[in-house]
Amino acid sequence: MGAPVLPAAFGFLASARTGGGRAPGPVFATRGSHTDIDTPQGERSLAATLVHAPSVAPDRAVARSLTGAPTTAVLAGEIYNRDELLSVLPAGPAPEGDAELVLRLLERYDLHAFRLVNGRFATVVRTGDRVLLATDHAGSVPLYTCVAPGEVRASTEAKALAAHRDPKGFPLADARRVAGLTGVYQVPAGAVMDIDLGSGTAVTHRTWTPGLSRRILPEGEAVAAVRAALEKAVAQRVTPGDTPLVVLSGGIDSSGVAACAHRAAGELDTVSMGTDTSNEFREARAVVDHLRTRHREITIPTTELLAQLPYAVWASESVDPDIIEYLLPLTALYRALDGPERRILTGYGADIPLGGMHREDRLPALDTVLAHDMATFDGLNEMSPVLSTLAGHWTTHPYWDREVLDLLVSLEAGLKRRHGRDKWVLRAAMADALPAETVNRPKLGVHEGSGTTSSFSRLLLDHGVAEDRVHEAKRQVVRELFDLTVGGGRHPSEVDTDDVVRSVADRTARGAA
């Protein structure tokens, strides 16, 4: 079963209260229409504001059940393994949307239902004085909460909770505190928080964790398994009758997704982004010509790219400068896409389970960094949909499909670094679908292909930051942008990157004196 063109809801701000009442006013970076819902259950209401594409009716993002205790679910994003999930439900009419599907699963499995779901979603469910907050296995739709006795607030954007922090939330031992936002916590990836509304106490149950064991497979079997898993994940993300759009760099990751999407849909649109100092247009063109896609190249001047740093921080709500460097060119690309809202597939994330960015030949060291990366991705928000929904588009990342991820992580390191090549098993899996030059092309990250890392460094150096202090200065710039936009409520258009860089450079110079 393919996906709808766009989810019923991109995000939400929800409030469950013992005394009823409206949810606080929404503050979203996501661009779209807002629809308010209120589902009174006596004095136990669940009120929410959904943000969704103007062309989409959000009805299927909300579901109510009157069997047993009245229950309401609100879901942002989408579920991919619908057919498998339907097969374990009792016979009857099919659920009308993903929110109703979650309710039906909860009736059968309670919170263990989330161990069955493969998707890109965040959800809040209320039944009586019980509130469930759940994320997908990767936390790819971030979910934040502020909990106090008698009230649970939850939002897919932390800034929505930052604007309403009275009363301050309880500490939550199993959730990550959001830096600078008192009482605001991020629900862990692959988890469901079971909250008692009356007391404000919470118990967190893990629904997915990265595997630590490794599988030894013959080359041919491993290659076939990777190809089949990726093709299935891409097909589940392609809407029947719609032409998908793939962000294409010309590397093996994005090109592999493009080849699978072309096979699933029969036709394909692609887009590549570069700057006036660096691009990968030639490499992408090799794939475009091979697959015969409708292609577009977008060039963003470096000064304009760096000026969009506030937007990248505002959208991702990340304070990690390395992650922001990865996300900045993507944020700029999505903002530059004109025309109607699009479903966009990316090759983002393949490097993490395959260890591609480490360029490590020693297998023990490769598996060590891979295990570390899989244990520490949570909270970085690399795949937050807000990076694209701030421009009205929906992105999805097949390499972080749960089945694909489980497979890639589990393969022994010698299948990832083999015959002197990084990501060997993926390259071999796509060898008959892509040009040889693409299959054999060495790894290059989007932040490198667009020159983002070097340009950000040059900006700081030009403001007098010593070379050995550049990374720390980047960290301070990103944190200040976070405090201004996410914590302080300022729109990125009101924040000047040069002013922030200048301020950080001055502080750095004074600290070094």
Swiss-Prot record:
Reaction(s) catalysed by this chain's protein: N(2)-(2-carboxyethyl)-L-arginine + ATP = deoxyamidinoproclavaminate + AMP + diphosphate + H(+)
Q: Partners and quaternary state?
A: Homodimer.
Keyword set includes Secreted: no
A Gene Ontology CC term for this entry? cytosol
Q: Which gene specifies this protein's sequence?
A: bls
Keywords tagged on the record: ATP-binding, Ligase, Magnesium, Metal-binding, Nucleotide-binding
Query: Mind listing the GO biological process terms from this record?
Result: asparagine biosynthetic process; clavulanic acid biosynthetic process
Record protein name field: Carboxyethyl-arginine beta-lactam-synthase
Q: What class of enzyme is it?
A: ligase
Signal peptide positions (record): none
**Species this protein is from:** Streptomyces clavuligerus
Q: Which family does it belong to?
A: Belongs to the asparagine synthetase family.
Pathway info: Antibiotic biosynthesis; clavulanate biosynthesis; clavulanate from D-glyceraldehyde 3-phosphate and L-arginine: step 2/8
Please share the entry's free-text remark on the cofactor. Answer: Binds 1 Mg(2+) ion per subunit.
Q: What Enzyme Commission number(s) does the record list for this chain? A: 6.3.3.4
Q: Which InterPro entries match?
A: Asn_synthase, Asn_Synthetase, GATase_2_dom, Ntn_hydrolases_N, Rossmann-like_a/b/a_fold
